[in-house]
């Protein structure tokens, strides 16, 4: 008799996605981040659910309710810090996952890639709204500054911002709706992730060489299930080390005082994982220009399949492109550092140069390098 996992309508979907899935025999640890992102999402939904049981989305009690969670709720402190640092681990995995896609040409699967970019946007929106919820100083001012960017949109900007705020400033209505959205978005992300997988399984996984692996497939289970479990253990080890030894390492001390609309913090900055985009935003001395650059810094990923000029899919055998890729990584790290610095000399000019370099690398230098490499193949 055929195994139930191959016949049952629901189980066979799971079977075809995680058990009998034909996978390339040579995918490296860079292919672990997809499953790690799934684990991060589940962890965030679970910890978030327990936090929501004790949190109150009201300007007068939000900050106190978070304090109450940490002091009075059984293991509330660990749930809170797992959620906060879980977001950091989520973004580390996201950046690694996207970087892998760029390096090995995974963006050639356009549907999968585009859903991935939408997932990135959705995750960034969710994290931003989550940061507002504790209602500390940086929560309030971060929300004020970022939502205010929409006022740069011609004609409808001001109305749009006041519509999002639900008033004339960030206040109770804003906090309540941000909580509602922050709660629903992870489920939308989960649904999109399933669509992401659906499209991926139409083509099968890419591999480090970028060459078709149809001639050499192995079953996902047990080979990659055991490999994924190792990745998950390392992820949990890193997360719990952070949570138990240095839970506030990645946070901003300015978010410890409760929100005060009458007192602006000296340096308004977002969480570390948004700093690269924040640096690009600040490097343009024009409001609308900065907003456009901010959006384009992520939206540019959509263009990757169009910017691919190489005859080879992966960068594995393309040393010039490899060099430029790692320069891009260094550039993003520079932008991340600049985003956390005050707006003064020499940080302003460094940020502007790094921003120009970012767009130049992706739009001009990398496609040019690919064309040069194509010509070198003829020698």
Curated annotation (Swiss-Prot):
GO terms for molecular function: metal ion binding; ubiquinol-cytochrome-c reductase activity. It comes from the Eukaryota. Heme b b562 binds at residues 83, 182. This is Cytochrome b. GO terms for biological process: mitochondrial electron transport, ubiquinol to cytochrome c. Heme b b566 binds at residues 97, 196. Belongs to the cytochrome b family. Heme 1 (or BL or b562) is low-potential and absorbs at about 562 nm, and heme 2 (or BH or b566) is high-potential and absorbs at about 566 nm. Keywords: Electron transport, Heme, Iron, Membrane, Metal-binding, Mitochondrion, Mitochondrion inner membrane, Respiratory chain, Transmembrane, Transmembrane helix, Transport, Ubiquinone. The lineage of its organism: Eukaryota, Metazoa, Chordata, Craniata, Vertebrata. Binds 2 heme b groups non-covalently. It is found in: Mitochondrion inner membrane. InterPro entries: Cyt_b/b6_C, Cyt_b/b6_C_sf, Cyt_b/b6_N, Cytb/b6-like_sf, Cytochrome_b, Cytochrome_b_C_euk/bac, Cytochrome_b_N_euk/bac, Di-haem_cyt_TM. GO terms for cellular component: mitochondrial inner membrane; respiratory chain complex III. It comes from Sylvicapra grimmia. The cytochrome bc1 complex contains 11 subunits: 3 respiratory subunits (MT-CYB, CYC1 and UQCRFS1), 2 core proteins (UQCRC1 and UQCRC2) and 6 low-molecular weight proteins (UQCRH/QCR6, UQCRB/QCR7, UQCRQ/QCR8, UQCR10/QCR9, UQCR11/QCR10 and a cleavage product of UQCRFS1). This cytochrome bc1 complex then forms a dimer. It is a multi-pass membrane protein.
């Amino acid at each position: 008799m055929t195994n139930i996992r191959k016949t049952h309508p629901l189980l066979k979907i799971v079977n075809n996605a995680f058990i009998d899935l034909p996978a390339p025999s040579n995918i490296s640890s860079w292919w672990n981040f997809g499953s790690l992102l799934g684990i991060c999402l589940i962890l965030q939904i679970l910890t978030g659910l327990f936090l929501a049981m004790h949190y109150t989305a009201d300007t007068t009690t939000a900050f106190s309710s978070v304090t109450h969670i940490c002091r009075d709720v059984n293991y509330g402190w660990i749930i809170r810090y797992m959620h906060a640092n879980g977001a950091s681990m989520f973004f580390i995995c996201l950046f690694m996952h996207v970087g892998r896609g760029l390096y090995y040409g995974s963006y050639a699967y356009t549907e999968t890639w585009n859903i991935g970019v939408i997932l990135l946007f959705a995750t960034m929106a969710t994290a931003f709204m989550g940061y507002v919820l504790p209602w500390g100083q940086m929560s309030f001012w971060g929300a004020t500054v970022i939502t205010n960017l929409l006022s740069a949109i011609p004609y409808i900007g001001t109305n749009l911002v006041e519509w999002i705020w639900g008033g004339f400033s960030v206040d109770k209505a804003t906090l309540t709706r941000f909580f509602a959205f922050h709660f629903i978005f992870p489920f939308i992300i989960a649904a999109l992730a399933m669509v992401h997988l659906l499209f991926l399984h139409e083509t099968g996984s890419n591999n480090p060489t970028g060459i078709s692996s149809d001639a050499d497939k192995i079953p996902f289970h047990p080979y990659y299930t055991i490999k994924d479990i190792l990745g998950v253990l390392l992820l949990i080890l890193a997360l719990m080390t952070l949570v138990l030894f240095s839970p506030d390492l990645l946070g901003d001390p300015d978010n410890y005082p409760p929100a005060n609309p009458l007192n602006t913090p000296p340096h308004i900055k977002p969480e570390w994982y948004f700093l690269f985009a924040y640096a690009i935003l600040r490097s343009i001395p024009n409001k609308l220009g900065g907003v456009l650059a901010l959006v384009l810094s992520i939206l540019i990923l959509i263009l990757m399949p169009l910017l691919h000029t190489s005859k080879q899919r992966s960068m594995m055998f393309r040393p010039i492109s490899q060099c430029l890729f790692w320069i891009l990584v260094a550039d993003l790290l520079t932008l991340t550092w600049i985003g956390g610095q005050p707006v003064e000399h020499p940080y302003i000019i460094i940020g502007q140069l790094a921003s120009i370099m970012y767009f130049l690398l992706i739009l001009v230098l990398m496609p040019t390098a690919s064309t040069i490499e194509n010509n070198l193949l003829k020698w």
